[in-house]
Each structure stands twice: as structure tokens, then as C-alpha cells.
Amino acid sequence: MDNLRPVLYLSMLLVLFLIWQAWNRDYGPQPVAAPGAQEQVMDRDGVPAPPQDVPDAPVSEAVDAPTEVAPAEPDRRRIRVVTDVLDIEIDTRGGDLVRADLPTYPVSLRTPDQPIRLLDERFRQYVAQSGLIHDRVPGVSGEGRAPSHHAIFQAERDEFRLADGQDELRVPLTWTSEDGVQVTKTYTFRRGDFLINVDHAVRNNSDQPWVGRQYRQIRHGSTPSRESWFLYTFTGVAYHDGRYEKLSLEDMAGKPLDKDVQGGWISIIQHYFLTAWVPFEHEINQFYTRVLGTPARPEHIIGMRSEAQTAAPGEETVFTSRFWVGPKEQAALKAIQPGLELTVDYGMLSFLAKPLFWVLDWIHNVVGNWGWAIIILTILIKLVFYKLSETSYRSMAKMRAVQPKMMQLKDRYGDDKQRMNQALMELYKKEKINPLGGCLPILVQIPVFIALYWVLLESVEMRQAPWILWIQDLSVRDPYFILPILMGVTMIAQYKLNPAPMDPIQQKLMMALPFVFTVFFAFFPAGLVLYWFVNNLLSIAQQWYITRNIEKAGKKG
């Protein structure tokens, strides 16, 4: 056991380092990509070719790529939409969502008036696009009959606000072709909701049939990535086609997506937040991915294209869809579409992290504070493993009691390690001691620790959640390092309660570990340090009680 305990602690230290590296990657300064202009592709006659970022039709069904010529840029406007939970900008070019702020989610507690920004057109960073493409009908030219996200729409005013007492806000944008096809693109916002309805109503006022499809896509301009060795929060493309699938931005070029899916959804995931196009469950769409730009400045697109719909002359057809732009709230996401809640990704220990979050959430609903919920969860975990810990601490207490006999064996056999180990095994057998028993608490804590790390890292409910006094955000480090220092003190106390290793080098190593752990924990989220600190306090109390009883029994005997 003397050799195994330091190895376990060093393994734990390695896990801490990997977690710390991942945490630093997520909360360190983010690099900013330089803006890059989209290259315009010319055909042989020097005329601009159709835009590359508009999806093509299936090969089996010919489709005219949109070739409408956008009016002069002065006709392009920004429409602002403000609800109680969203502050949106819509570009009249394409009717795209080019900015999305979440006023109820500030960037940090120090800047409460600066909201999190998800969609952001600057540097081509993050834009939600949608439009229509026209199928070729024999004898009918599709040119200019369907507005892509390059077309210029008209809006009745420049700002829409959800008024007090109003539950729904509709923002209509209109486009009309030269032959009389009128398209009304309508965004519908609801109070307290991050889900936006997006409809394209096609009114065919021409004398020719209209046949076309709707496409929806999210465009993401990559910034230089910073990978960690082991644990990280996934940022990239995710979709659901009956199964939850992830595709990193780096892999999109080599693994393009192209499949027909009923229902499902497509998304780009960020830490704590999500943007996703969510069709209705009965719809069949073709999911696709594209990578544009240059290797140095790639632009990633994930999208979906609907089946064709027809509007005869004088008739109307409507394309519907939904777009989520907001936090990864598991209950809300699960209610929208099956599998959407899986974007809250707890990593390789999801089977353990999910029940931990469920219990934490239940406790929080009772006590109303995430800090106290973590403390109560720690107590419950300790109760679950009480008997296992009791067995381990009894073994360690017995080891401590026979320490003098072990020192006598060391003096007797000196450097003869073979005879020394044989004598120790006989002593353990005689005293009914399991030399590996003291390692069990460490082994039990490691997976729980990692799972709780994922819960704190991925659950937006924990973001900026206060506890008491100076701890106003359990998802970031203690600003004054008080909890890490207290945690280090508890580790020193635990070291004093445990039997000291016989090897002097191992003794020095075990004495140094509390200080090393304190340094690592100083940069971990306060909620995680709180869990470890309370767990150590409970372990010390349990170990002290068991050790005292065994020592009393030894004196009586």
C-alpha cells in the first residue's frame, strides 16, 4: 500500500492537470480571427457565378441556382428586434439573423449590462441564414423567382419591440420577383422563449407555376482552436438523424454531411449555449455541410434543404421552421425536439454526470441555492459510500496501529526488501489488514470528481450561480482563493490521520501533495472546490471517529 497510495495521488494529480488545462482553454483569452473577404468566383465570360454558399438541388432534380442581382447597398438595412430575453438584428439582405444578444445572460457579473452575444456577423463569425431555391419547371425560367439569403427584403420599420402585456411579436419581411411572385418571410418571437418561428410564405401572382425548396443553414467562421489533451467542451457541428452525432469544425472538410433525415435538427454548439435549426418532426430534409474560404480562414456551413413545394398561379404555399438561439437548458430543449437536450454533453462519464445533475437540480428546487445543493449532494454521496469508506478507514486505522511493528521489521531486515515484504505480508495477515483498503476512497472520488466537473462545466444552470459571501459565481474560480486554501488545510489534516509511508521519499512526496493540489484547485470553479472541501471535512470526521474507536478498543484489549 505504501507504494500504491502515492501512485494514486499522482494519477489524481495528472487528472487535475488535464482538467485544469481544459478549463484554461475554455476561460482563457480567446483569439480573434482576422476578417476575410469572400472570394467572388467568375465564369469564363467574367460574369459572377452563383454564390457558393447557397445549397444546390439534388442531382436527380435540376434546380436553378439563385441569380438575382441585389440592389445597391443603400437599400440594405438592419432591423432590430427586442423581446424580454432576446435582442436580435435582422439584415434585410436575405433576412438573415446577424446578431443575437441574450440580455438575461451577461458576459460576467462584473459587466451586467454586457450580454452574451451568440450570433455575430463581424469577421463572418456566426450567422443564421435561410432562403428559397427554385426548381426548374419545363417551359418556366426559375431565374429571379426565389429569394436566397443574398436577396434584398423590405421591412415596414427598423425596430420591433415586444410591448408590456404582449405575448407574441411578428416581424414580416417581403420580397417580390419581376413576374409577381411575392415571398413574405416572417419571424415570430414569444415572451420568455428562445425559440423563433421562421416562415416563408410564397404567393404566386404570376401566370406560371412556382416550384421550390426552403433551405436553412448556420455559417461559422472559425477562430484558431486550442485543443487540450483530454477533457474539453465540444465546440462544433452537431445534428440528430435518429442518433446524436458530432462533427468537429476541423473534420468537416474531410467528412461532408449529405443525408435525408425526417425530423431531427442541426446545430453549432458553444460553451453553455446553442444555435439550432429545428424542423417539425414530420418534415424530411436533406442535411448537408460545406467548407468555404481558405485553409487559413475557413468558413463552415451546416444546413438543411426541404422537399419541393408547389404554388400554382394564384395560390400560396408556406415553408415553416424553427430556430433556437439561447442557453442549453435541458428541460426546454427536450420539449422542443427529441435528442436536442443531448447537446449538453457531459463527456465520457455522462452516465454518472446526468444523475448527478438530476439530483443537484432537485435539491436546488428545494433549497434555492446551487452552493447548498452541492454541499447536500456531497453529503448524500458520502452516505452512499459510507460502508465502503468505513472499511477503508478501518484498514488505515489498523495500519496506523501496527506502525511500530512495521518499523521494527524495517530495522530488523534493513535493505533486504524481499524478506521485508514477506514479513509485512505475514503481519498484515496476522492483524487482518487489507493493505489496499486505504486506497478505495481515492478510487471512488476520481470518477465522481470528473463527473461533477462536467456538470459544472456544461450546465448553464450553474453559470454565474451564487453561493454565499464572496462566492458569487460557482462556475469560476474563487476570486480570493479562500476555498482552495481551506481545501489544502483539510488535505494536510487527512495526511496526519493516515499512516505515514515507511519510505522517506514517499513521506516527502505525500507532504508536498496538499500544496500542489491547492495550487491546481486555486484555478478550478469554486463549485468543484466546494465539493472537494466538504468531502474532505466529512472524510476527516469519519476517519477520526473510526480511528479513535479502534485505538480505544486496542487499549482495552
Curated annotation (Swiss-Prot):
It holds the Pfam family 60KD_IMP. InterPro entries: Membr_insert_YidC, Membr_insert_YidC_N, YidC/ALB3/OXA1/COX18, YidC/Oxa/ALB_C, YidC_ALB_C, YidC_periplasmic_sf. The keyword Transferase does not apply. One of its GO terms (cellular component) is plasma membrane. Residues 34-60 are annotated as: Disordered. Its main location: membrane. The chain crosses the membrane at residues 3-23, 366-386, 436-456, 480-500, 514-534. It is found in: Cell inner membrane. Keywords: Cell inner membrane, Cell membrane, Chaperone, Membrane, Protein transport, Transmembrane, Transmembrane helix, Transport. One of its GO terms (biological process) is protein insertion into membrane. Interacts with the Sec translocase complex via SecD. Specifically interacts with transmembrane segments of nascent integral membrane proteins during membrane integration. Belongs to the OXA1/ALB3/YidC family. Type 1 subfamily. Required for the insertion and/or proper folding and/or complex formation of integral membrane proteins into the membrane. Involved in integration of membrane proteins that insert both dependently and independently of the Sec translocase complex, as well as at least some lipoproteins. Aids folding of multispanning membrane proteins. This is Membrane protein insertase YidC. It comes from Thioalkalivibrio sulfidiphilus (strain HL-EbGR7).
